[in-house]
Amino acid sequence: MTPTNPRTPASATASVPVRTPVHLDLRQDVALLTAALIDINSVSGNEGVLADAVEHALRQVPQLELVRDGDSIIARTNLGRPERVILAGHLDTVPLPTTEGSLGTVPAYWPSGAPGEGILYGRGATDMKGGVAVQLALAATMFDGGAEPGKDVTFVFYDHEEVEAEKSGLGRLVRNHGSLLGGDFAILLEPTDGTVEGGCNGTSRFEVTTNGEAAHSARAWMGSNAIHAAAPILARLAAYEPQTVTVDGLDYRESLNAVKIHGGTAGNVIPDRCVVEINYRFAPDKTPDGAEAVVRELLDGFDVVRTDSAAGARPGLNHPAAASFVAAVGAEPKPKYGWTDVARFSELGIPAVNFGPGDALLAHKDNEHVEADAIRECLRALRTWLSA
C-alpha cells in the first residue's frame, strides 16, 4: 500500500502524487550538510522539497516538538529551562544565476576536489544554507550522550524570505503560531562572517510630489516646470547630514537619499508633475512614525507621502542572554545597517542579533560561496554557548 502524505487530504491521494522526502544526514560534517542543502534547489516559491526533507529529518529527534505551516517549520525543546533561545533561518534562495560558467548554482561544487575541504560554491552557500545547516546539526546532536542544552531552544525554518514581505513564512508563523515563538533572545543565522551584528536599521520609503503646468517647451513661459520645482527637495536632501545614533552601545549610521525621480511626458512638453522617491534608513531608536516626522520636517512645505515602512530592531545586547552570547563568540559586536528579520522578533519584544557563517557581500552573487571552516566555527560557537 502506498503511504499517504500526512499533508495531503485522504480524498486527494488518488490524484496527487506522493512526494518522498529527500534524506538528510544531520550528523554528517556540517559543511557536507550545507552542500546537501544546496543540492536541493529551493528558490523562493519552491521550498517544498527542502521543507519536506527538513521536517522528515527533525522528526527523528524525539526531544523536539514540531509544527509545520506550509513550508515553514517550528521545532522546540520543552525542558523547562528558565531561558528560551530562538535560532531562525530561511530555506529559500534567490533565483539561480543565468551567467554561463557561474559557480554559485546547483548542485554544490568543491573546487578542491575533496568534499568538505576549502571553499564551497553554490546558490545559498552564504545566504543562508550554511546557517540552516548549523541549525539542523545543533538540533540533531544537542542531546547526544545524554547531554541536554542549558537553555530551551526553538528552531525556526521558514519560506519566502527573499521576496515581498507579505509572503514571508516567518510573518505567517507569527500570525498563526505566535504562542510558539516566545523567547528571551533570538539569533538569525544570516551571514555575518562570524561576527555578532546587533539589531538592524529601519527603512521607510516616501514620495514627494511637485506640480506645475504643462506647456509647449518653445513657449515655456506659458507653463510651470514641475521638475524645476523639485530642485529644493534635492538640495535639502543633499545638504542633510545623516545622524549616527548610539543604541545599546552600537553606532547605527543613518542615511536619507533620493533614490528615484520621474516626471515629464515628452521632450517638447513642460512637465506638469514630478515625483521624487526617497529612502530613509533610520536607527532603531526611532519608530516609523518618528522617521516620517524627520522627513516631513526636512521637507516642510512639500507633499510627502509614506509608501512603505519597516521598523528597525534594537540589539538588546544588555539582556543577559545576549551578553553571554557575545562573550562566548568572543568578537566585538557590530551594528546591522540593512534590514533583516530580526526586526520581526523585535516587534514581539524579543532582543535579536544576526550571527552566521559567510560573507554577506557574497550573497546573491553569481559565484556565491562560503568557507567550510567558517560553517564549522559557527557551529562550534553556538554549541558551546547552548551547552553552558
Predicted regions: what they are:
Residues 66, 73, 153, 302, ...:
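Hydrophobic anchor at the start of a short beta-strand
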Residues 84-154, 169, 366:
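Active-site metal-coordination/substrate-binding segment of hydrolases
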Residues 72, 159-163, 263-264:
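Short, internal active-site loops enriched in acidic
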Residues 88-89, 156-158, 186-190, 209-211, ...:
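Short beta-strand segments
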Residues 128, 132-201, 248:
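Acidic/histidine-rich catalytic neighborhood of metal-dependent amide-processing enzymes
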Residues 2-5, 16-18, 25, 191, ...:
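Metal-dependent amide/peptide-bond hydrolase catalytic core
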Residues 81-83, 115-117, 149-153, 180-184, ...:
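Short coil/turn connectors at secondary-structure junctions
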Residues 2-97, 273-279, 294-297, 372-376, ...:
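N-terminal helical capping/dimerization or prosegment-like subdomains
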